[in-house]
């Protein structure tokens, strides 16, 4: 059975949440968001280790019950996501790595299964994604509609995103060297010439970004427990 390492970048501040602490440490029920996320990842038998990347002034993570879990390793991040992920990759020993947002606590085992199965299909990697359903508009700088964008081949990129470890590290390093803005790991791989596979995932794998997302994530977690 192939095994994977998960890298969870958790060094961000989450300013859009307008909270007094980083959003990953806000509570959903009796656990913080990041605890829900890590619990879901730890439950998968093919994930042998999780590397959690935190800010150098983080004083929250060490107080969590999961902080001393034998399959969790902590390392320090940087001023942007790509640097944090690259730092996390230095602790990965498996051939393949999954990178997952700390603020996506609703990831399911079935989505993890589907993504990992894609590792058998090639060396370009794969990401979870959902097809765009809404009508998409492109705006000008004044937020006026310029055109309607054909949605037939548009997808919302989610996480985890899964790639061969060394290829991803090289791609991120190259992007940072060229001062390219890397909004996710797939964008680094794309610029390096790879064509990652889109694996259709569940639309309830939401990222908690704004205050209103907290209630939605709590509801999704409750509903998933009933499945």
Swiss-Prot record:
Pathway: Isoprenoid biosynthesis; isopentenyl diphosphate biosynthesis via DXP pathway; isopentenyl diphosphate from 1-deoxy-D-xylulose 5-phosphate: step 2/6
Top-rank taxon, per record: Bacteria
A Pfam family this chain is assigned to: IspD
InterPro entries (alphabetical): IspD, IspD/TarI, IspD/TarI_cytidylyltransf_bact, ISPD_synthase_CS, Nucleotide-diphossugar_trans
Protein's GO biological process: isopentenyl diphosphate biosynthetic process, methylerythritol 4-phosphate pathway
UniProt xrefs under CDD domains: CDP-ME_synthetase
Site note Transition state stabilizer, residues: 16, 23
Catalytically driven reaction(s): 2-C-methyl-D-erythritol 4-phosphate + CTP + H(+) = 4-CDP-2-C-methyl-D-erythritol + diphosphate
Similarity comment text for this entry: Belongs to the IspD/TarI cytidylyltransferase family. IspD subfamily.
Protein task: Catalyzes the formation of 4-diphosphocytidyl-2-C-methyl-D-erythritol from CTP and 2-C-methyl-D-erythritol 4-phosphate (MEP).
Protein name: 2-C-methyl-D-erythritol 4-phosphate cytidylyltransferase
Organism: Tolumonas auensis (strain DSM 9187 / NBRC 110442 / TA 4)
Gene: ispD
